[in-house]
């Protein structure tokens, strides 16, 4: 698969997003581009108020594009805002091209419950219902299906309750990590 990135965003993050729609794809710098070859072209632009990402995705000779704009709100880090803009653009282009909307939205990595917990804590600090606000953000900003957003907030709530009871010599157990797009040879999750 050919991947083109223009803008200040990590290549690995963009690859993990591409793997949502192209599972098992390899990314080669030397691969020649042809009209039939799978490709994603991503452009990220920024100004003082926002980040705007545009994704053009090609598969089987067909092509779709989408863009997403995320405001710099002074609350989230610029890195998180950039990632949301890029994720939303790639997700929408892929959803249109393939006709599917993956239930986990743009959540990648092995600890999405950590994000849900951070969102809930932030909402509670502002006087909101933490779980409800976290679910709203997960479905709205991160494009997760409502049932997956609810599951994440439940996992986050349970993690938070357990963390207080586990001593410093405790450990975490992960069961079926659906978020990580790769299975590295050294990974203990496999």
Please describe what each predicted stretch is:
Residues 168-190:
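Canonical Radical SAM [4Fe-4S] cluster-binding loop centered on the CxxxCxxC motif
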Residues 97-101, 121-122, 131-173:
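N-terminal [4Fe-4S]-dependent radical SAM core
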Residues 1-2, 18-20, 24-79, 83-87:
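Short, well-ordered secondary-structure micro-motifs within conserved domains or adaptor modules
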Residues 6-9:
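Beta-sandwich/jelly-roll carbohydrate-recognition scaffolds of carbohydrate-active enzymes
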Residues 82-102:
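Conserved, surface-exposed functional patches that form binding/active-site neighborhoods
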């Amino acid at each position: 698969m050919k991947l083109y990135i223009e803008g200040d965003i990590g290549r690995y993050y963009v690859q993990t997003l591409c793997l949502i729609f192209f599972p098992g794809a390899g990314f080669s710098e030397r691969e020649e581009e042809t009209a039939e070859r799978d490709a994603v072209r991503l452009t990220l632009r920024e100004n003082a108020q926002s980040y705007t990402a545009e994704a053009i995705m090609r598969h089987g000779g067909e092509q779709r594009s989408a863009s997403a704009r995320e405001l710099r709100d002074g609350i989230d880090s610029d890195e998180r805002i950039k990632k949301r803009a890029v994720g939303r653009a790639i997700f929408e282009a892929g959803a249109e091209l393939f006709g599917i909307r993956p239930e986990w939205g743009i959540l990648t990595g092995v600890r999405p419950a950590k994000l849900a917990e951070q969102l809930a804590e932030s909402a509670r600090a502002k006087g909101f219902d933490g779980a409800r606000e976290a679910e709203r953000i997960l479905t709205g900003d991160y494009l997760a299906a409502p049932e997956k957003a609810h599951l994440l907030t439940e996992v986050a709530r349970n993690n938070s309750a357990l963390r207080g009871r586990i001593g410093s010599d405790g450990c975490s157990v992960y069961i079926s990590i659906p978020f990580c797009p790769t299975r590295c040879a050294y990974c203990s999750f496999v």
